[in-house]
Amino acid sequence: MDKFSQSPPLRDDLVRGSSLNWTKEKENILKGPFNYLESHPGKDIRSQLIAAFNAWLDVPEESLNVIRRVVAMLHTASLLIDDVEDNSQLRRGIPVAHNVFGTAQTINSANYVYFCALKELAILNNPAVIQIYTEELVNLHRGQGMDLFWRDTLTCPSEDDYLEMVGNKTGGLFRLAIKLMCAESPSHNAHPDPFQRNDYVPLVNTIGLLFQILDDYKNLSDTIYTQNKGLCEDLTEGKFSFPIIHAIRADPGNLVLINILKQKTTDDEVKKYAVAYMDRAGSFSYTRKVLRGLTKKALTQVDEVDAGRGRGEQMKTILEKLRVDRNHQRGVLTPAAGGASIA
């Protein structure tokens, strides 16, 4: 008898590719970075938006729970990847996951959760949701890819290109949630002609732009944001955010700001100088003006979607929370000597 015939047989589950021996302990290992970040929740604007849109869509609770889980999973997983790609140090006031678990394990955890979320959607037994999921995950990666390209090549995008990127990256997860809800809403699908159904996408696109530009604004001007993510983190990342793009394009011949971005500085005084420069360029006042315009547009879209049904109050409450004048901090960041404060 040769030595190979004496070898123990392979377990049947290994031969057949069964996952019966996949244990909770192994699952926790893979999801470690994901669970770490998930245990420190953010403000969860996405759940609030789902609840507000559901006042119109009336999605069955069982389907809505699946959608909530999927959106939460994707959001947290995308933050894990964002923090790696941006070399961030803090997220929600705690060390980023890749500084705790390592970069490779964090990337794998996030990618794993993307597919776990897809498996969750299969519960709905609706082919349309898989198409929606794929489409918006493609959009998310397109947006992220352009954002990274501009940063890594020190290329200042046009405002239109930036808004397109935001529509793909930030708007993608917002749209994903609402499109999934529409696919699972009996009342929404009751009309036989799809072109006669309410279109919620323009509203959610506006909210995505509003949310991201407000986030850009707060990153450079908000003390609470500084506590959670660090002082003017966008400058340290070398990111072309909305106010930064305005300041650079307001005076293309002045290379001060673009050189500060190139340095990816951690020097607080340099960052405060950059903020003062943007303030003098009118970039913060311009950003506030754009945000007010987006809020006004969103409120108009709420009334159009509601069409007199009286179900838009939750959405208006959310928009009130996102109003820039509620988030505007005065005189937060000033250089140690000289320079203008935020007006």
From Swiss-Prot:
Site (Important for determining product chain length) residue list: 114
Entry binding sites for isopentenyl diphosphate: 43, 46, 75, 92
Top EC category: transferase
Positions with a binding annotation for Mg(2+) 3: 215
Positions with a binding annotation for Mg(2+) 1: 82, 86
Residues binding Mg(2+) 2: 82, 86
Cofactor names: Mg(2+)
Catalyses which reaction(s): isopentenyl diphosphate + dimethylallyl diphosphate = (2E)-geranyl diphosphate + diphosphate; isopentenyl diphosphate + (2E)-geranyl diphosphate = (2E,6E)-farnesyl diphosphate + diphosphate; isopentenyl diphosphate + (2E,6E)-farnesyl diphosphate = (2E,6E,10E)-geranylgeranyl diphosphate + diphosphate
GO biological process entries: alcohol biosynthetic process; isoprenoid biosynthetic process; mycotoxin biosynthetic process
Keywords: Magnesium, Metal-binding, Transferase
Residues reported in the UniProt entry to bind dimethylallyl diphosphate: 91, 169-170, 212, 219, 229, 239
Highest taxon above the source species: Eukaryota
Bilayer-spanning residue ranges: none
An annotated Gene Ontology molecular function: dimethylallyltranstransferase activity
Cofactor note: Binds 3 Mg(2+) ions per subunit.
EC number assigned by the record: 2.5.1.-, 2.5.1.1, 2.5.1.29, 2.5.1.10
InterPro entries reported for this sequence: Isoprenoid_synthase_dom_sf, Polyprenyl_synt, Polyprenyl_synt_CS
Protein task: Geranylgeranyl pyrophosphate synthase; part of the gene cluster 4 that mediates the biosynthesis of an isoprenoid secondary metabolite.
Family: Belongs to the FPP/GGPP synthase family.
Protein name: Geranylgeranyl pyrophosphate synthase 1
Organism of origin: Zymoseptoria tritici (strain CBS 115943 / IPO323)
High-level lineage: Eukaryota, Fungi, Dikarya, Ascomycota, Pezizomycotina
Gene: GGS1
